[in-house]
Amino acid sequence: MRNKLKEIAKDTNIFLQKFITKQKKTELIPAMKYGLFPGGKKIRSKILLDIGSIFKIKYQTLIAIGAAVECIHAYSLIHDDLPCMDNDTLRRGKPSTHIKFGEATAVLAGNSLLTMAFEILSSSYLRISEKSKLSLIKRLSECSGHLGIAGGQYLDLNFEKKKSFKK
């Protein structure tokens, strides 16, 4: 199991490295990479591969979809660490993205990773039907926005605010 998890993490990182390498170079790329490649087990990709294999979906297709999900996860962690959110200065034993690159750059790097997920899903790297691509994009959008990650973060912030008022 551990070897399979390491293999999936490696393949997901290789896909992401290649995808980023083909992007136009901007000053945001280092901050994006910093937030995307801090280590981590890529457990979301492993879960996706396990489920996808039941439906006989090709390994490389699942790696690409998993890479998009990892971009969303990295964006959420970068934003979660910001001073206006949880104000965490460390992530996996390293300075958070906003500590290393500044708050504004961290916000933009997170936003760029969010949109890069949709670039991956709409790209020619993902060899599935357009209908399937649209379905994936719709679902990932829902899971990332006010019905998903952003909505959850909002609830977390409101809970913390209410907790501090009670003290």
Regions found by a protein language model. Give the residues of each.
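N-terminal amphipathic alpha-helix initiation
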Residues: 1-12, 24
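Mg2+-dependent prenyl diphosphate-binding active-site environment of isoprenoid biosynthetic enzymes
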Residues: 10, 17-167
